[in-house]
A protein has these predicted regions:
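Conserved functional hotspots at enzyme active or ligand-binding sites that engage polyanionic ligands
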Residues: 1-124
Length: 124
């Protein structure tokens, strides 16, 4: 079974917990730019809604040593190298910037991201 056939259970749109390549330009200040893998964190009702947006967190390939970043092994998702989910860099992007699916984040990693985001936003 191919990697691609495991995904797209949301009518071809990104689903929560999936990693997609997203065109992040334009960006402001210190935000990640270019086309990068991103974790989809918005719920599927938003992802398939009329607003045509998704909420994502970029994944960088450089370890900056920031405690809130979650490490992703390239064997867990189809990445070229070890990635680091930047939990402090939450973005809304239009669906037309979302390009291709790289896989589904393991449940344990998704829980770690949710915990870090909750701490950063004072929700938990």
């Amino acid at each position: 079974m191919s990697v691609k056939s495991l995904y797209h259970n949301n009518n071809g749109r990104p689903s929560r917990g999936e990693v997609w390549w997203v065109k992040l330009d334009p960006s402001k200040n210190h935000q990640t730019v270019k086309t990068r893998p991103c974790l989809v964190i918005s719920v599927d009702q938003v992802n398939s809604g009329a607003a045509n947006i998704v909420i994502v967190i970029p994944i960088e390939f450089e370890n900056q040593g920031i405690a809130s970043h979650v490490r992703v092994d390239p064997r867990e998702v189809d990445l070229k190298a070890t990635g680091f989910i930047q939990c402090e860099d939450i973005r809304m992007v239009p669906l037309d910037r979302v390009q291709s699916c790289a896989g589904v984040l393991p449940v344990g990693k998704m829980v770690e991201v949710e915990e870090n985001v909750s701490l950063l936003l004072g929700l938990g």
